[in-house]
Amino acid sequence: MLVIAVENVPPRLRGRLSLWLAEVRAGVYVGVYSAAIRARIWDDVRKLIGSGSAVMVWSAATDSGFDFETIGANRREPVDFDGLTLVRFLPPASEDRVPP
């Protein structure tokens, strides 16, 4: 199973995703593909994302049963915690903030 959710992306990316996946709700696409096809679809997302954001989730042989990847401004980051995938919420980017 493969799920891609997008926000604030250009119409051409939505159209491209609709070629491969079923849009079950606005911005949420679902399908079943191999790892190779999944990588090709994600490459299209990377190229066409613009200023939007996206998350791709797929079935995987892990303790949690899934894995995911994110791209864009509203990023959350996957973190491996002893074989279990957890989500790290990244702080908002700020010009005033000094990196640690």
PLM regions: where:
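Basic nucleic-acid-binding interfaces
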Residues: 1-5, 9-100
